[in-house]
C-alpha cells in the first residue's frame, strides 16, 4: 500500500494512493478513516490524485537522522567511517511535503541537498533487536536532509544547520510493502535542474536498517510515525534560489521540491 496525506475538498486526511506508479493521471486517493497504523479502514470517499494536494505523508513526533552512513559521502566530506551509527535530530517543524518550497535562510550559504531513504516507524518500540526491526516499521518514504554547510562547520554541532523550517522534505507517500524490491538494496537518484547529482544503492549503507533501528531504539523510545533518515551517499551539493530538487528511490517514487530564497514568494 502507498499511504499519503492529502488536502482534499473535504479537508486533510490520510489516503491510500492507488494506481500504477508513474501514471499520475490514473492514480486515485482513497480516504483512510483516522490513522494508517494497524489495519486501515476506509471512509468510502476517493478523488483523482490530480484533484488533491499531497502533503508530507506523516507528521512525526521526531526525525532521527543517521550521519556518515555511506563511505563515499564520508570521503567527500573528509571524514572517517564511524564504528557505531552517528545520529542527530531534526525538529518536526522542518518537515514539508512534495512540491512545497525549500526556503533558504538569508544568512546561510552554501545549503546542500541530501537524498535519503527514510524509515517510518509503525508502533511504539524500545530496545528493538536488529532482527525484529521490520516488525516495528510501517514503511518507507523519501527524505531530503537539507543542510546549511557554513553553519554546520562553524557550530561544531548540527542542530542549527539542519533544523531550519523546510529543511526536511518528505514524501511523496509511505510504501508499506516494497515487494518485489528489497529496502536493503534500492536505487537512489537525486537530480537538480535535470542533472543527476547522486546515484547509489541503499546496499552501500555502512549500518543497515536493522542496525539503525536497534541502535536508535536502545537510546530513545520510537513512536508511531517517527521518521528515521538513513544517511546520504556521495554527490551532495549546493542548491540555489530557482532550483528544483527531485529524489527518486526505486519502488517508492519521486520527491520533488522547488527552492526559493527566504523573503521571496
From Swiss-Prot:
Molecular function via GO: acetylpyruvate hydrolase activity; metal ion binding
Gene3D superfamilies registered for this protein in UniProt: FAH (2.30.30.370), Fumarylacetoacetase-like, C-terminal domain (3.90.850.10)
Binding site for a divalent metal cation: 114, 116, 145
Record bears the keyword Metal-binding: yes
Signal peptide per UniProt: none
Keyword annotations of the record: Metal-binding
Cofactor dependence: a divalent metal cation
Keyword Metal-binding in annotation: yes
Family to which the UniProt record says this protein belongs: In the C-terminal section; belongs to the FAH family.
Record-given protein name: Protein Rv2993c
